[in-house]
């Protein structure tokens, strides 16, 4: 019984704690990558993403459309 308790403690508590990474690492990495971009490049990327949105039919548009209503 004691052996199973020790095994459960190791695998359910200690092992996940040892393998966890900082939650803020990916965010910091993305921020560092975007700091190198100049403002014009960021605007271009944003405009490209907005152009890729689907247009809706004006007959059934609910106001959530980007360009079509």
Swiss-Prot record:
Keyword Oxidoreductase: no
Signal peptide, first to last residue: 1-20
In-chain residues carrying the UniProt-annotated modification Pyrrolidone carboxylic acid: 52
PTM sites of type 4-hydroxyproline: 58
Keyword tags: Gamma-carboxyglutamic acid, Hydroxylation, Pyrrolidone carboxylic acid, Secreted, Signal, Toxin
Principal localisation: secreted
Pfam families per UniProt: Conotoxin
InterPro entries xrefs: Conotoxin
Recorded GO MF terms: ion channel inhibitor activity; toxin activity
Annotated compartments: Secreted
Signal as UniProt keyword: yes
Positions of the propeptide removed during maturation: 21-51
Family membership: Belongs to the conotoxin M superfamily.
Function recorded in the entry: Probable toxin.
Protein name per UniProt: Conotoxin Fr3.1
Native source organism of the sequence: Conus frigidus
